[in-house]
Amino acid sequence: MKKSAALGRLTALIITAFVDMVGLLMIIPLMPYYARNFGASALMVAMLMSAFTAAQLLAAPFWGRVSDRYGRRPALLVGLGAAAIAYVVFAFANTIWLLLLSRIVQGAGGGTTGVVQAYVADAVEPEERAKALGWISAATNVGVALGPPVGSFALKLFHVHGPGLIAAALCLFNIAFAWRYLSESRDMVEAKKVERRKGASLIAVKHVFTHSKEAAPRLIWVYAIGIGAFQGITAILALFLADRFGITADRIWVIFTFMGTISVITRAGVLGKAVDRWGEVR
């Protein structure tokens, strides 16, 4: 693939991932406050926050086959469409169960993270993938930094419906942008010739459990434990800050913006140089 074409595709992908994360992080910090308004317990809030990941995990094998068979672009557009629907449900939710439904719909729609990573694998040369993923991560972390204040200000200006509706509008913009500027990264003529082995996803998962001492499964375990710990903190952070320090929904953005800013500095300023100096494995 020509370098200019790969760069253009990567740029479009970075913008898509950034806008998607802004919409997501408009909602995540506010979700516990909305749930508490409906009388949810701390356990229910944690379940609510994890519903997206659980639904995404269950739907992942299906969307993996769709992505391989029909292309990355359609799978990404479906994920963005599911997110738009989920945000509208969130905006008008009047029970905890509708909040839960919004999370499940978004997760079952496939999300975007896996598809974005597959895009990078298709479009970028192997020696440049770590840097490309670093820039994608930096873009999403800029979204982490900017999404919470936008969500909190939307709540102030437009009340409870505002964050969900603005996040849905961002999703619709993102769909239009991706449709126009993000070309398919997979060679679909060749893809249709390749038959995906039945049960390949389950075999891969089993391999991670049964061959945990190998490099790839070990890396997956390290990542899973790290991201699991982070997500666990995120799920209860708003409740902890509200109970301990009286942080309200219109001020929670400060904490998430700080976290996102630190992540941007690490991913964009440190990761690429570290890979250049020590290599991907180290």
At which residue positions do the language-model features occur?
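Pair of pore-lining "gating" transmembrane helices in MFS-fold secondary transporters
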Residues: 6-32, 213-233
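Short amphipathic helix-loop junctions that connect adjacent transmembrane helices
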Residues: 29-42, 235-251
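Conserved MFS/SLC helix-loop-helix module at the cytosolic interface between two early adjacent transmembrane helices
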Residues: 57-94
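Cytoplasmic helix-loop-helix junction between adjacent transmembrane helices
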Residues: 102-141
